[in-house]
């Protein structure tokens, strides 16, 4: 498996992976809500690549995009030491070390870039993700009550952080 920076050529596979992830109910988008096309996604990848406060990595296995992690660093003096993470892994590749490999790359990049705090959110009932994040050293910081509406019902999110 190769972990590398995303390229514009990844746009189509990235959109397909996101559609699959949206169907899980654990991501921000509802199934079918994501309206991005390949050209718009290519531009978004190019913008992230050009943004020094962003870092976008993908995991590729046999020329197939199987996971990603987006790192969105604070843009101001007071929060540039902190970065928010978004992770997604193809359901067929979970439990095979894809997420761990992506996290390890982010930890290395963060230390080089002077990022000392990583944070993420996870839907409270997404126990596999919560357990993975805990295994990777993330600590529960708090609970965001009724932060999302899923199938018409309020759902809480956990805030988690890791200090480097």
What are these regions (language model features)?
Residues 2-16:
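A short beta-loop-alpha structural element at the N-terminal edge
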Residues 8-11, 24, 28-92, 103-104, ...:
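Acetyl-CoA-dependent GNAT
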Residues 64-67, 128, 154:
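Glycine-rich acetyl-CoA-binding "A-motif" of GNAT/NAT acetyltransferases
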Residues 97:
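Conserved G/P- and acidic residue-centered "switch" motifs that form tight phosphate/ATP-binding loops
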Residues 103, 110-121:
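Conserved GNAT acetyl-CoA-binding A-motif
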Residues 119-123, 134, 139-155:
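Conserved catalytic-core motifs of GNAT/GCN5-like acyltransferases
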Residues 155-164:
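Terminal substrate-recognition subdomain of acyl/acetyltransferases
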């Amino acid at each position: 498996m190769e972990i590398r920076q995303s390229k514009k050529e990844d746009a189509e596979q990235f959109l397909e992976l996101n559609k699959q992830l949206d169907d899980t109910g654990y991501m921000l988008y509802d199934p079918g809500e994501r309206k991005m096309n390949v050209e718009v996604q290519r531009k978004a990848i190019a913008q992230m690549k050009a943004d020094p406060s962003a870092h976008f990595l993908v995991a590729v296995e046999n020329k197939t995009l199987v996971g990603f992690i987006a790192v969105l660093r604070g843009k101001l003096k007071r929060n540039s030491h902190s970065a928010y993470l978004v992770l997604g892994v193809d359901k067929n590749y979970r439990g095979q070390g894809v997420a761990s490999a992506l996290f390890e790359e982010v930890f290395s990049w963060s230390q080089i870039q002077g990022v000392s705090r990583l944070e993420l959110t996870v839907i409270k009932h997404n126990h596999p993700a919560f357990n993975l994040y805990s295994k990777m050293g993330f600590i529960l910081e708090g609970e965001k009550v009724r932060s999302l509406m899923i199938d018409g019902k309020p759902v809480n999110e956990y805030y988690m952080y890791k200090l480097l």
